[in-house]
Amino acid sequence: MKERKFFGTDGIRGKVGSGQMTPELALKLGWAAGRVLSRSGTKKVIIGKDTRISGYMFESALEAGLSAAGLNVMLMGPMPTPAVAYLTRTFRAEAGVVISASHNPYYDNGIKFFSTDGSKLDDNLELEIEAELEKPLVCVESHLLGKVSRIEDARGRYIEYCKGNFPAEHTLTGLKIVVDCAHGATYHIAPAVFRELGAEVIAIGDKPNGMNINDKVGATSMGKICETVLAESADLGIALDGDGDRIMMVNSKGEVIDGDQILYILACDAKSRGVLRGGVVGTLMSNLGLDLALQALDIPFARSKVGDRYVMELLKELDWRIGGENSGHILNLDHGTTGDGIIAGILVLAAMRRQNATLEELTSAMEMLPQVLVNVRFEGEHDPLKSDKVKAVQAQVESQLGLRGRVLLRKSGTEPLIRVMVEGDDHSAVLAHANLIADAVKSAS
């Protein structure tokens, strides 16, 4: 496949005002996408965004470009990424566009597209859009310009969709839940969803100002929610990231429940109800404890490359339904086409209600093995992973760890780093093993 110049694995992303994330590029991108998408379908595109201050600028530029290509645009305002995917399907739009940089700081932003079925846009269509970007922008004639409108009830539609994923025979009455919205796109949705299902909700990270998204709150910064769960004597906490496609949870003891543990809960619940299709897809970074816990239940487990895009690809290849990353991207293809933090939280709460169990009880049979990650910076064009010394040290460590341990060495896709990950039963031994391999990588650099 031809190498892509603009699109990465999750759309276009970068620092606002530099590189690709400029209003000029957004305008041209809207026009180029409009040219490609107008060749078939309804000529209707939905745009949603998170709460970054730059989102308004990019929204205006994109809608102008799409209109100039003859496409009608429907604006949603601040809405979670999975909400854009859902409403793209229900409105039978030709595509959905999300303006977000997910868990990144406010000064970054990004643009990604969903196809008409709510899945990530096909690689070939992205290549066609890139080809159009190389051409001069030519506006359609005035009578062919696209119209721009707003979806006034987008919030209500998505809240009802989320609630529809919770079993009708149960409620959340009696549960006290802390919900951290990361000052992001779920701020006006997630607390309402859980309140309307009956829970007492304490919302934090629900006051976006355009520049505080993901700032010491949300799924990538768990300190605040852990403190709040303990201070409020809450039953659990749900932390979402800036665009709502990622979730981490907290039990009543203030302990973090990560994506691997959430996958375990969902797989166990599905198996107990006889609805588990196949097994579970994790990634190369998934904790070995998840693998071993699923083995004990005779649930197959497979690993993809890191990234929810690759989890989705392997799920489709195996025809399985449940997969995700330890970072909190959770996919359940029976309940959506993309990662959805609110839906994942609802499914965990449903499992708690069905089994009349606490979050601690649902994860008690899964032992998370100590995992140490060391980043080693290197210089030059050579690959330290090809070093005989590094290979020898890795083999030595793997031999000592046996079946209750794991070593993973991989290059960062964005920085000159080698990521050294070691898992095993004993934290001090795992740390020593990781440092031993890291030293070998440094000496080979």
Curated annotation (Swiss-Prot):
CDD domains: GlmM. The modification Phosphoserine is found at residue 102. One of its GO terms (cellular component) is cytosol. Catalyzes the conversion of glucosamine-6-phosphate to glucosamine-1-phosphate. Its EC number is 5.4.2.10. It holds the Pfam family PGM_PMM_III. The gene is glmM. Binds 1 Mg(2+) ion per subunit. This is Phosphoglucosamine mutase. Its cofactor is Mg(2+). Activated by phosphorylation. It is an enzyme of class 5 (isomerase). It catalyses: alpha-D-glucosamine 1-phosphate = D-glucosamine 6-phosphate. Mg(2+) binds at residues 102, 241, 243, 245. SUPFAM superfamilies: Phosphoglucomutase, C-terminal domain, Phosphoglucomutase, first 3 domains. The keyword Phosphoprotein applies. Belongs to the phosphohexose mutase family. One of its GO terms (molecular function) is magnesium ion binding. Keywords: Isomerase, Magnesium, Metal-binding, Phosphoprotein. The active site is at 102 (phosphoserine intermediate). InterPro entries: A-D-PHexomutase_a/b/a-I (IPR005844), A-D-PHexomutase_a/b/a-I/II/III (IPR016055), A-D-PHexomutase_a/b/a-II (IPR005845), A-D-PHexomutase_a/b/a-III (IPR005846), A-D-PHexomutase_C (IPR005843), A-D-PHexomutase_C_sf (IPR036900), A-D-PHexomutase_CS (IPR016066), Alpha-D-phosphohexomutase_SF (IPR005841). GO terms for biological process: carbohydrate metabolic process; peptidoglycan biosynthetic process; UDP-N-acetylglucosamine biosynthetic process. The lineage of its organism: Bacteria, Pseudomonadati, Pseudomonadota, Gammaproteobacteria, Alteromonadales.
